C-alpha cells in the first residue's frame, strides 16, 4: 500500500474475518485495528472542528489578549491569520499521509530519525495532550464567566465568588463529559447542530453589533462608527514597545484559531479520512480566519472606550460584555451575550469530545499510567468512556486554578496556544528537514508549495514560542499576580515528563503501538496486490501491508 507506518519493512499480511473498505485497510496499514465507528462525514468533522474553533465565544474570551494589548485594530488578526493558515495547511498535508487519531505524534514517530523517534514522539504527545486537556476547561470557564457576567449585568448587586465560578464551570464540564460518552451517531448529530447554531449565532451577533449599534446615542459627542484611522490604528496598552506588544497580541488569535487540528484526531471516525480530514482542517482554518477577521473589523469600528473596558466599572468580569454595553441597549446586550453563552457551551462540548479521543489514542500507545484502563472502548456505545472520565478528572484539577485568581486560571489559555503550536509544527519541521526527500504525501497535498509553506509555518512558530511567554507588564509592575505563568506550567510539565522518560519510560516507550493481535499477523508472506493502490472494498480474508522501502533510517 506504500504507507510508512509502525508496520513498515516487516513484509506482513493481516488476516481479517470481514469485508473491509479502503479506510479500514489504510488504518490496518498504519498499524491499528478499527475500533471506532466511521459515522462522521466531511461535514460532521468540519462541524466538530468549527465548533471547537468557536469563533464567537473565542473572540469574546480573548478580548484580554488582543484588544486590551494593542487596541481595537483588526491588523493583529489579519497578520496572524496568514501565518496560522500556513501552519494549518502543513498539518493538513500530514493528516492526509497519516490519517489516524494519534495525530501529530504518530507522524513524528514516522518522520523522525530512528535514534530519536521515541523521545520526539513522547515530547510531541505530552505537548499536544497539554493543549488538548486545557481546551475544554478554558472554554467552560469562559462560558461560566459570561453566564455570571450576564447575571451581574441584570442584577448589579451580584458579584460572583471564585467558588461560584468553579461550581458553575464544573456543572458545564459534567454535562459535556456526559454527552461525550454518547454513541458516535448521536454525537455527530449534536455536533452538526452545534455548528449550525454557532454559525447562525455568529452572524446574528455580527448583525446586532452593526445594526444595533447605538453608541452615538449612549454616549454624546461621538459618531456612529469610528474613523478609519481610529479603527485601524494601534493603541499600545502594554508596557513593551509597540512591535513586541503587537506580537504578544497574537496570543488571542492563536488561541481562538486553535481548533483546526480536531479533524486529524477524528480521522478514525470519518469515512474517506485521507481526504476528508485534511479538507476539514483547511476549511476550518480558512473559513474561520476570514469570518473572524470580519468580526474584528466590526469591533474595531464600534468600540468606544478601551480604558472603560479595562477598568470594568460594573464589575462584570468579561471585557466582551462590557464592550457590548458601550454600543447596545440592555435587551440587545442580554440577547447577544446569551447567544455567545450557547455557542460557548457547544464549543466546550466539542473540545471535550476531541480531547477524549486524543487521550484514547495516546493511551492505546501506552503514554499514560494505567493506559490499559483509559484505552478501553465501551462495547455498548463504541466510544472511549474511560478516556472521557480521565480527562474530566484532570480538567477539574486544572480548574482549581480559579481559586488562585484571574492570572492563574488565565494560564490555561496561553498554555493551549503555546503547546498546540509546538505540537502542530513538529511533524512539519521533520518533513522539511530530515524526511525532506523521503516523505510520501497522501492524496491531499500541497505539491510544490509544500516546502515553502512548511518553512513559513516553522519560522512563525519559532518566533511565537518565546513571545507567548511574555507578560504584558515589566519592571516593578511585574508582580506574581501579573506574571505570565505559561513558561513555568508548560515547560515545568515538559521537564517532568522528560525526566520520567530518561529515568524510566525510555525502557519501554517506543512510540505508537499496533493494537492488531499477533494471531492475525502473518510474517514473510507476499501477495500479488502488494504495493497497489488501496481498493474501495476488500473482499478477502487477508490484507497485505506492503513491505515499503526503508524510508526512515
From Swiss-Prot:
Record-annotated membrane-spanning stretches: 43-63, 68-88, 133-153, 163-183, 190-210, 240-260, 280-300, 333-353, 397-417, 453-473, 485-505
Transmembrane as UniProt keyword: yes
Pfam family, one: AA_permease_2
Subcellular location(s) of the protein: Membrane
Keyword match Transmembrane: yes
Example of a GO MF term: transmembrane transporter activity
Gene Ontology annotations for the cellular component aspect, listed alphabetically: membrane
Superkingdom to which the source organism belongs: Eukaryota
Membrane topology field: Multi-pass membrane protein
Keyword set, alphabetical order: Membrane, Transmembrane, Transmembrane helix, Transport
Family that this chain belongs to: Belongs to the amino acid-polyamine-organocation (APC) superfamily.
Protein name: Putative polyamine transporter
Source organism of this protein record: Candida albicans
Amino acid at each position: 500500500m506504500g504507507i510508512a507506518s509502525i508496520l513498515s519493512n516487516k513484509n506482513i499480511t493481516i488476516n481479517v474475518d470481514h469485508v473491509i473498505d479502503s479506510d479500514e485497510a489504510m488504518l490496518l496499514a498504519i498499524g491499528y485495528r478499527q475500533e471506532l465507528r466511521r459515522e462522521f462525514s466531511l461535514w460532521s468533522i468540519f462541524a466538530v472542528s468549527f465548533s471547537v474553533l468557536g469563533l464567537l465565544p473565542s473572540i469574546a474570551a480573548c478580548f484580554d489578549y488582543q484588544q486590551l494589548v494593542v487596541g481595537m485594530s483588526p491588523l493583529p488578526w489579519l497578520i496572524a491569520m496568514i501565518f496560522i493558515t500556513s501552519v494549518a495547511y502543513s498539518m493538513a498535508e500530514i493528516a492526509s499521509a497519516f490519517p489516524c487519531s494519534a495525530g501529530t505524534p504518530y507522524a513524528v514517530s514516522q518522520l523522525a530519525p530512528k535514534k530519536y523517534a521515541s523521545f520526539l514522539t513522547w515530547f510531541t504527545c505530552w505537548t499536544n495532550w497539554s493543549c488538548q486537556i486545557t481546551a475544554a476547561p478554558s472554554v467552560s470557564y469562559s462560558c461560566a464567566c459570561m453566564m455570571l457576567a450576564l447575571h451581574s449585568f441584570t442584577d448589579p448587586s451580584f458579584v460572583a465568588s471564585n467558588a461560584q465560578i468553579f461550581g458553575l464551570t464544573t456543572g458545564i464540564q459534567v454535562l459535556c463529559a456526559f454527552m461525550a460518552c454518547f454513541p458516535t451517531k448521536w454525537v455527530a448529530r449534536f455536533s452538526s447542530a452545534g455548528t449550525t447554531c454557532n454559525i447562525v449565532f455568529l452572524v446574528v451577533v455580527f448583525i446586532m453589533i452593526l445594526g444595533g449599534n447605538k453608541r452615538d446615542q449612549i454616549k454624546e459627542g461621538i459618531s456612529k462608527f469610528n474613523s478609519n484611522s481610529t479603527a485601524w490604528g494601534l493603541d499600545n496598552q502594554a508596557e513593551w514597545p509597540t512591535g513586541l506588544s503587537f506580537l504578544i497580541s497574537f496570543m488571542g488569535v492563536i488561541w481562538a484559531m486553535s481548533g483546526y487540528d480536531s479533524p486529524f484526531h477524528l480521522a478514525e471516525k470519518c469515512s474517506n479520512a485521507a481526504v476528508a480530514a485534511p479538507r476539514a482542517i483547511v476549511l476550518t482554518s480558512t473559513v474561520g480566519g476570514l469570518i473572524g477577521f470580519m468580526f474584528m473589523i466590526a469591533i474595531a469600528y464600534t468600540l468606544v472606550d478601551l480604558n472603560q473596558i479595562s477598568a470594568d466599572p460594573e464589575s462584570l468580569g468579561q471585557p466582551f460584555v462590557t464592550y457590548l454595553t458601550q454600543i447596545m441597549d440592555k435587551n440587545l446586550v442580554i440577547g447577544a451575550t446569551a447567544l455567545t453563552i450557547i455557542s460557548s457551551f457547544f464549543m466546550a462540548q466539542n473540545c471535550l469530545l476531541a480531547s477524549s479521543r486524543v487521550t484514547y489514542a495516546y493511551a492505546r500507545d501506552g503514554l499514560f499510567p494505567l493506559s490499559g484502563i483509559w484505552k478501553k472502548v465501551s462495547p455498548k456505545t463504541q466510544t472511549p468512556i474511560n478516556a472521557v472520565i480521565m480527562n474530566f478528572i484532570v480538567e477539574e484539577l486544572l480548574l482549581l486554578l480559579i481559586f488562585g485568581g484571574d492570572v492563574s486560571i488565565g494560564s490555561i489559555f496561553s498554555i493551549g496556544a503555546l503547546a498546540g503550536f509546538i505540537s502542530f509544527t513538529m511533524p512539519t519541521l521533520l518533513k522539511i528537514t530530515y524526511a525532506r526527500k523521503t516523505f510520501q504525501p497522501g492524496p491531499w497535498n500541497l505539491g510544490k508549495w509544500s516546502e515553502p509553506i512548511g518553512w513559513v509555518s516553522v519560522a512563525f512558530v519559532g518566533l511565537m514560542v518565546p513571545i507567548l511567554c511574555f507578560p504584558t507588564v515589566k519592571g516593578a509592575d511585574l508582580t506574581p499576580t501579573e506574571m505570565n505563568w505559561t513558561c513555568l506550567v508548560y515547560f515545568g510539565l515538559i521537564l517532568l515528563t522528560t525526566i520520567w522518560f530518561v529515568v524510566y519510560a525510555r525502557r519501554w516507550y517506543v512510540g505508537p503501538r499496533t493494537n492488531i493481535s499477533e494471531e492475525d499477523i502473518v510474517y514473510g508472506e507476499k501477495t500479488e496486490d502488494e504495493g497497489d493502490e488501496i481498493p474501495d472494498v476488500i473482499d478477502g480474508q487477508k490484507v497485505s501491508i506492503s513491505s515499503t522501502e526503508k524510508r526512515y533510517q
